[in-house]
Amino acid sequence: MSILRFASVTREIGAFVILDAIEGAVALGDRIGLVGPNGAGKTTMLRLAAGRDEPDRGTVVRKRALSIGLLAQEAHFDAAFMAAPDLRTAVRTGAAHLDAMAEELAAFERDGRVAQHAYADLQHRYEVLGGYTLDQRVEATLSGLGFTRDEWVRPPTGLSGGEQTRAALARLVIADPDLLLLDEPTNHLDLDALEWLEEHLRRRSGSLVVASHDRAFLDATVTRVWELRDRRLTGFRGDYSAYHRQREERDVRAAKDAGTQAEQIAREQELVQRYRSHRKFSKMHEHEARLERLQAERREAPRQSRRLALPHSALAGGGPARSG
């Protein structure tokens, strides 16, 4: 069952079509890598999924009450985050719903007239959602993403650009939405933080769509791949390496089909000219009709694009190099 679906979604910016009637669905527990050349529309897709932008045509269908978290390439924080006295408190604002539940539990405890079953139900939900371990999880997340204990007590207003991105990621980890959307999340992570994030994403039960140029990261975290190419979306099963093999096989088949079709078109053009020169117009019209059908169905050979061959993060300058 899908929790989010792109239904014939088209997105245009001025005269340019960025996405053209794309179709795709995210199921509960999916971990999807979103790949394609720079400018293909990956960020646009993530913003549409998050509801930050609206499609020009088509619909983004979301499951009712679906919680969505988006990590943009440039972090933007709300007033609650920026007003926090320190980084640890700021990151904790990602779990504001748990703090609200804790206040409700405290109110129940002060009011002896509250039904015991209502209190027990709320307490159980609070425990299942990790309320009793929230402080430990905040500290573990900050440590995992490379923040030292000294940095935990710094005000969020003093964060650098890279620190802001890591802080935004930490807050999303604590929020733990049903659908996590990440746009180039490895950009400001060292190797230890990168490996911590990979392990976290593999463990979490929620769904994930991540746009990244880091092949090793995608191999470590995703089980499906969406490829954006020429304004269209194509899905593949498996990690990045499996996708790359499937894409190469598909491109070889497409190139062969395009070559065969080009030969057929050339042959029909030759016959049209031959019958025209001999004034055999009935035959000429017959082959003109065949030629029109072939040209209408014409398949182009896949275009080779160096940008589409995703580099390792070290080559792209987007993260740490790895061995192995």
Regions found by a protein language model. Name each.
Residues 1-254, 313, 318-324:
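ABC ATP-binding cassette signature C-motif
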Residues 104-106, 138-139, 287, 303-307:
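Short coil/turn segments at secondary-structure boundaries
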Residues 105, 112, 126, 133, ...:
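Leucine-rich amphipathic alpha-helices with coiled-coil/heptad-repeat character
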Residues 116-123, 266-274:
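A short, surface-exposed helix-loop junction/capping segment
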Residues 153-154, 277-281:
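Short, surface-exposed loop/turn segments at secondary-structure junctions
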Residues 246-271, 284-298:
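Intracellular alpha-helical coupling/juxtamembrane segments of multi-pass membrane proteins
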Residues 269-274, 280, 292, 308-314:
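Alpha-helical coupling/stalk and coiled-coil linker elements that connect catalytic or binding modules
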Residues 300-318:
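Short, flexible cytosolic linker that couples an ABC transmembrane/permease module to its adjacent nucleotide-binding
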